[in-house]
Amino acid sequence: MASPTMKLNNGLDMPQVGFGLWKVENSVCADVVYNAIKAGYRLFDGACDYGNEVECGQGVKRAIDEGLVKREELFIVSKLWNTFHDGERVEPIVKKQLADWGIEYFDLYLIHFPVALEYVDPSVRYPPGWHYDDAGTEIRPSKASIQETWTAMEKLVDAGLSKAIGVSNFQAQLLYDMLRYARIRPATLQIEHHPYLVQQRLIEACKTEGIVVTAYSSFGPASFKEFNMEHAEALTPLLEEPTIVKLAEKYGKDPGQVLLRWATQRGLAVIPKSSREKTMKSNFEAVGWDMEDSDIKTISALDKGIRFNQPANYFSTDKLWIFG
């Protein structure tokens, strides 16, 4: 079974169901990527900050060497970290990331967060994380503007280092500003999206502007409990939420499939992950069946406006209220 594709605004076809690589441990990452390719996944969503791009590339190489897939059949996504936003830093770090993956180009490259931090040389610490110092106490902003960074991103397309470019964790006002000066429009926006954080107006804004939305953390608090976030622990896990469980029974699916289909049926791409082959295959079936419109609305009504993936939820800071 192949994932259906979504047409990006540059004509590129992007698989609607991909495989996320956040928190995939280095020790198993190569095998996880290889097994995901065997299970049918073709889009892999990585990032500098995940710290596992070398191992991701090893899994891809193994699959290609064994004839399971060709490079051109894969859709590999990566992201620009905050410490590389200065215009002259963008291309060098992309080339490093490509070398880590062992590939010549990305299919899609995103600005990870709309936050510019002071440069940390990869030879000093990589991935650099949010803090300038090794002790993890000092946040140092860079003076790079989003426009400066985006101009450098556009040059990646010109140089053939990425086929498409986009953004992640941006809000509508930043997107509207970008569209005033962008020579190459962002092809996608990647956002935290689950029934506890629907962001429907942002999704509608992207649809109007021809920007495809990719949902991450589709299972909500399940991805964040290990960080001891009180609000993640206080909420009913979405995989156990009575509304979701009831709909899973109604459609003969598991709760994870219901959560993913809620997104894909509304026109979003998804990037779930699992190290278990059974769950890999289950998550891949987030398309090919439909729920009634009333059930889609019932899931959306669970919205609480609760966001998990913001810096202040990971460490104490008064400087990084990105979504304020």
Swiss-Prot record:
It catalyses: xylitol + NAD(+) = D-xylose + NADH + H(+); xylitol + NADP(+) = D-xylose + NADPH + H(+). The record marks K79 as: Lowers pKa of active site Tyr. One of its GO terms (molecular function) is D-xylose reductase (NADPH) activity. Pathway: Carbohydrate metabolism; D-xylose degradation. Gene3D superfamilies: NADP-dependent oxidoreductase domain. It comes from the Eukaryota. NAD(+) binds at residues 168-169, 217-226, 273-283. Induction: Overexpressed during growth on both D-xylose or L-arabinose compared to D-glucose. Significantly expressed during late stages of infection of barley leaves. Keywords: Carbohydrate metabolism, NAD, NADP, Oxidoreductase, Xylose metabolism. The keyword Transcription does not apply. One of its GO terms (biological process) is D-xylose catabolic process. Substrate binds at H112. The active site is at Y50. It holds the Pfam family Aldo_ket_red. Transmembrane segments: none annotated. Its EC number is 1.1.1.307. The keyword Oxidoreductase applies. It is an enzyme of class 1 (oxidoreductase). Belongs to the aldo/keto reductase family. Catalyzes the initial reaction in the xylose utilization pathway by reducing D-xylose into xylitol. Xylose is a major component of hemicelluloses such as xylan. Most fungi utilize D-xylose via three enzymatic reactions, xylose reductase (XR), xylitol dehydrogenase (XDH), and xylulokinase, to form xylulose 5-phosphate, which enters pentose phosphate pathway. This is NAD(P)H-dependent D-xylose reductase XYR1.
